[in-house]
């Protein structure tokens, strides 16, 4: 398989893109989060779950490498002269893990996409971005908006939600999670100047008492849950994810907020990343925390996210064990997740010293 794959360095790929960009398909085999932080312009992210990888047993089908049917059809029809595979920094394809994304993608392309020449990018994205930064798209991390755009607070923000006028917990402004998804507090949601500066077209209000200040200007989705251990936020995951996707598909941007932008709204953003990108909770948590450092979903919400993870990543697991939000997900086997997260809700215990639980939390979601 390796003998069928050519090698390009950064200069070679630059020349290829300059001559035949429309006939060159770039497949980035890094994680979703690495790809989102920066990638070669026009490249496509290749990713699949560990369950799919395990089932493949070293022979991944092209439908998993290029899941977009139209793109895959063009590839099989010979519309692409070259397909270039890359990871973060590998110097040679033969050094890639046999069950890794890069090797599995190369194998599938060599077996099924015979009309195109397959290449491996030596040095990966790291080398190419250093040599040709103008051909790469990068997201600044964290990306936020500074607070003092104006000192006035709308009249509508002075009642119904006390935090709107006292953002003492805020560290900076709203943050970009994805190009179409932003996270922040009720105070940010009361600042039309901030929302307009970010290009926001819709808001998800994850609270029972914070008002929707500008219903004549933006589309709103209300999720009336409290930030406590009794609240079932997972039953709203599907609706929230569908709403975000509908705004994204319409070319809009969604701002998700609760009162403080710490627990409820962060939980919705985490669920969105986990479901749409099939990543584990700890990966999604680290990704969001890098952008808004004060996030801290309460202990119950973390448990609901873990249940969500077990069913998102394990398609054989019994969906009946999860919340209503999981009814349409695949089923799979259970997984064990170990992580360290701060939690902000009091934990009821006979020992009063344990008024707040600090991890590590070890959880084995069960089917």
Swiss-Prot record:
Processing and modification events after translation: Phosphorylation at Ser-359 and Ser-364 by MAPK1/ERK2 and MAPK3/ERK1 reduces its rate of degradation.
GO molecular function, a single term: growth factor binding
Residues annotated as domain Rhodanese: 20-137
Keyword Transmembrane carried by entry: no
Catalytic class of the enzyme: hydrolase
Keywords: Cell cycle, Hydrolase, Nucleus, Phosphoprotein, Protein phosphatase, Stress response, Ubl conjugation
Tissue expression remark: Expressed at high levels in the lung, liver placenta and pancreas. Moderate levels seen in the heart and skeletal muscle. Lower levels found in the brain and kidney.
A Pfam family this chain is assigned to: Rhodanese
GO biological process: cellular response to chemokine; cellular response to hormone stimulus; endoderm formation; intracellular signal transduction; negative regulation of apoptotic process; negative regulation of cell adhesion; negative regulation of cell population proliferation; negative regulation of DNA biosynthetic process
Modified positions (Phosphoserine) in chain numbering: 359, 364
TM helices/strands, residue ranges: none
GO cellular component: cytoplasm; nucleus
Catalytic reactions of this protein: O-phospho-L-tyrosyl-[protein] + H2O = L-tyrosyl-[protein] + phosphate; O-phospho-L-seryl-[protein] + H2O = L-seryl-[protein] + phosphate; O-phospho-L-threonyl-[protein] + H2O = L-threonyl-[protein] + phosphate
The keyword Hydrolase appears for this protein: yes
Residues at the catalytic site: 258
InterPro entries (alphabetical): Dual-sp_phosphatase_cat-dom, MKP, Prot-tyrosine_phosphatase-like, Rhodanese-like_dom, Rhodanese-like_dom_sf, Tyr_Pase_AS, Tyr_Pase_cat, Tyr_Pase_dom
Function noted in UniProt: Dual specificity phosphatase that dephosphorylates MAP kinase MAPK1/ERK2 on both 'Thr-183' and 'Tyr-185', regulating its activity during the meiotic cell cycle.
Protein name per its UniProtKB record: Dual specificity protein phosphatase 1
Source organism of the structure: Homo sapiens
Gene that specifies this protein: DUSP1
């Amino acid at each position: 398989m390796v003998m069928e794959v050519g090698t390009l360095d950064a200069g070679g790929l630059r020349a290829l893109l300059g001559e035949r960009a429309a006939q060159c398909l770039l497949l980035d085999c890094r994680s979703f989060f690495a790809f989102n932080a920066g990638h070669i312009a026009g490249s496509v992210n290749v990713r699949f779950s560990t369950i799919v990888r395990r089932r493949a047993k070293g022979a991944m089908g092209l439908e998993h490498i290029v899941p977009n049917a139209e793109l895959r059809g063009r590839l099989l029809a010979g519309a692409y002269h070259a397909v270039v595979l890359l990871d973060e920094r590998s110097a040679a394809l033969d050094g890639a893990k046999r069950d890794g994304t890069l090797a599995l993608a190369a194998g599938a392309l060599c077996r099924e996409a015979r009309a195109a020449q397959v290449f491996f990018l030596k040095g990966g994205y790291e080398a190419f971005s250093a040599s040709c930064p103008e051909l790469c798209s990068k997201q600044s991390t964290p990306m936020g908006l500074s607070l003092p755009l104006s000192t006035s607070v709308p009249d509508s923000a002075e009642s119904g939600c006390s935090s709107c006028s006292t953002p003492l917990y805020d560290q900076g402004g709203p943050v970009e999670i994805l190009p179409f998804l932003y996270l922040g507090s009720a105070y940010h949601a009361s600042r039309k100047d901030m929302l307009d500066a970010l290009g926001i077209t819709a808001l998800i209000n994850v609270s029972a008492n914070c008002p929707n200040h500008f219903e004549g200007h933006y589309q709103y989705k209300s999720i009336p849950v409290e930030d406590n251990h009794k609240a079932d936020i997972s039953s709203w995951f599907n609706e929230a994810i569908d709403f975000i996707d509908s705004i994204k598909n319409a070319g809009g941007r969604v701002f998700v907020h609760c009162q403080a932008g710490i627990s409820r709204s962060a939980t919705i953003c985490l669920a969105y990343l986990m479901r749409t990108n099939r990543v584990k909770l700890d990966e999604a948590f680290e990704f969001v925390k890098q952008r808004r450092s004060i996030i801290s979903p309460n202990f119950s919400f973390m448990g609901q996210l873990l249940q969500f993870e077990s069913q998102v990543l394990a398609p054989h697991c019994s969906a009946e064990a999860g919340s209503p939000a999981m009814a349409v997900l695949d089923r799979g086997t259970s997984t064990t997740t170990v992580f360290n997260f701060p939690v902000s809700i009091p934990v009821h215990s006979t020992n009063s010293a344990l008024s707040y639980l600090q991890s590590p939390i070890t959880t084995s979601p069960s089917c």
